[in-house]
Amino acid sequence: MALPTQQSEELRLYQQTLLQDGLKDMLDHNNFIDCVLKIQGKEFPCHRLVLASCSPYFRAMFLSDLEESKKKEIDLEDVDPDVMGKILHYIYTSEIEITEKNVQDIFSVANMFQIPSIFTVCVSFLQKKLCLSNCLAIFRLGLLLDCPRLAVSARDFVCDRFNLIARDSELYELSPDELIAVISSDSLNIEKEEDVFEVVMKWASKEKEKRTKALPVIFESIRFCLIPQDYIKNKVEKHELVKPNKELLKKLQIVKDAQQGKLPSLKKKTSAKASEGKDGEQVVNGELDEEEEALPGILNDTLRFGMFLKDMIFMISDTGAVAYDPSANECFFASLSAQIPKNHVSLATKENQLFVAGGLYYNEESKEEPLSSYFLQFDHLDSDWLGMPPVPSARCLFGLGESENSIYLIGGKELKEGEQMLDSVLCYDRPSFKWGESDPLPYKVYGHTVVSHDNLVYVLGGKGNEKKCLKRVCVYNPKKFEWKDLAPMKTGRSLFGATVHKGKIFIAAGVTDTGLTNTIEAYDIKTNKWEDFTEFPQERSSLSLVSMNGTLYAIGGFATIENESEELVPTELNDIWRFNEEEKKWEGILREIRYASGATFIAARLNILRLTKM
């Protein structure tokens, strides 16, 4: 009777362990040694049977008619003895210490002697260590050692971060074939194909005479059909390396003809059958399949991965993050992370970096200031939130703004006994990942709103001394390190929505000294004047304003609504409104959206291929 699967596996594992322990014991006591590997003066006693069972290289050697198959002592060249010692230790114990310093050497020797288990361990180690500084080196290593699994992982990492990698000089040291392997990928995370052309020409310009010869082949991997005709005419054809090259101009003419509907005659294309390589990856072999018809590669018009970006309303709450596409009336899950604190503030920078600050964080290591606030950044690649250096002093009811490479956390109330109002401004330097202090506000304020425009940071309204709602508006110029007062708002308010829309700052609803309001004002930045705007249909506090693709949206907030007991109670609403420019009125487009409770709302560009449709 056959044993149950689990019991069978346990017995197998036990027998493997027993066998391996026995072999190691015999090695340690010099029993049945029939082989000695000699490397640079060092000797490694071992067993032929063990080497042959783990390595096709040694198996072939011992089974051949070569002189080495009969000798007890075998000299190995081009091998580091320390590395070989680690590999032999692994063969007998399944234990090996792989570090960033030795992984390449161990990888190369494991590849040389065809030891797949160590090969796989090294590949997994390198995949986990992939980063901006080493991804190209690992990509080239994968190609050098004929390891598709590693090369593809590294290439995908490069493609995901192509715009960042393009700033690295190492990209421009790739060979033509290596460059083609990257830029021919559908997974390239770029919004415009023009970026690929510019990278290729920058690469070619490094060694003009040598690399220009490779351009006709490389051009086949640039998807010129995705590039506007004006750009091809004014930038591509007039480039100094393209203009005198008749072969390149001929290829570009094919593209221009295709854009006008004149496709070339189809060519017969012979495809090769795929088989599995040693890593289980699909590799191409020499078997020819039947012929098929195909257009020239330069006419490839398949969109890249990064071209599926869409402008969306990003809703961030402590239960998850949801993206809403008003143009298609579709909702997507972006993240179900529970890291987001309640009562947070969110910010989208002009580079589409998304940040959240707020909540209460207790740092045991800081004795002077143990309380701080969370600071998180959204990772577009993994659709998750990354913990950043926490806000040094815990506070609430503050505002977030940005200028250049800095994020400003302005005013608010201390999250400690007394809840003191603050005029202090904290500055987060994005390149160094450090918090510091900036020039303080001219006054203490909380419940205000902050917007950013043209590298200036605007602070509007809020509550000041004696909890009075302020009309005051200030702007901060980081280059001059100064605050300046601007024309005051018509109505003092706090807990209101604000956004920059078509060159003006719009503020909507909120709390006044007499209660809730539905009034909206617009500030003309050029003239320093406020004007009234179409009122919102309902008095609310904490209404959010979002400007996206030339349209103004109003979302959520709190209104005073009569309940079943006919009592007026503050009620949170999760609806979305859009302003109709032609009819000059607000229109409701979504009555309620999930995960919007307690959320903040910002405009963000998100890749729909990374999102899950609700």
Swiss-Prot record:
UniProt name for this protein: Kelch-like protein 40
Superkingdom of source: Eukaryota
Subunit architecture: Component of the BCR(KLHL40) E3 ubiquitin ligase complex.
Compartments reported by the entry: Cytoplasm; Cytoplasm, Myofibril, Sarcomere, A band; Cytoplasm, Myofibril, Sarcomere, I band
Every BACK domain range: 135-237
InterPro entries documented for this protein: BACK, BTB-kelch_protein, BTB/POZ_dom, Kelch-typ_b-propeller, Kelch_1, KLHL40_BTB/POZ_dom, SKP1/BTB/POZ_sf
Family matches, as PANTHER family: KELCH PROTEIN (PTHR24412), KELCH-LIKE PROTEIN 40 (PTHR24412:SF22)
CDD domains (alphabetical): BACK_KLHL40_KBTBD5, BTB_POZ_KLHL40_KBTBD5
Function: Substrate-specific adapter of a BCR (BTB-CUL3-RBX1) E3 ubiquitin ligase complex that acts as a key regulator of skeletal muscle development.
Origin species: Xenopus laevis
Tagged with keyword NAD: no
Name of the gene encoding the protein in the UniProt record: klhl40
N-terminal signal peptide: none
Chain positions of Kelch repeats: 353-405, 406-455, 456-503, 504-550, 552-606
Family assignment from sequence similarity: Belongs to the KLHL40 family.
SUPFAM superfamilies: Kelch motif, POZ domain
Keywords assigned: Cytoplasm, Developmental protein, Kelch repeat, Repeat, Ubl conjugation pathway
Recorded GO CC terms: A band; Cul3-RING ubiquitin ligase complex; cytoplasm; I band
Gene3D superfamilies membership: 1.25.40.420, Kelch-type beta propeller, Potassium Channel Kv1.1, Chain A
Domain BTB: 33-100
Gene Ontology molecular function, alphabetical: ubiquitin-like ligase-substrate adaptor activity
A GO BP annotation: positive regulation of proteasomal ubiquitin-dependent protein catabolic process
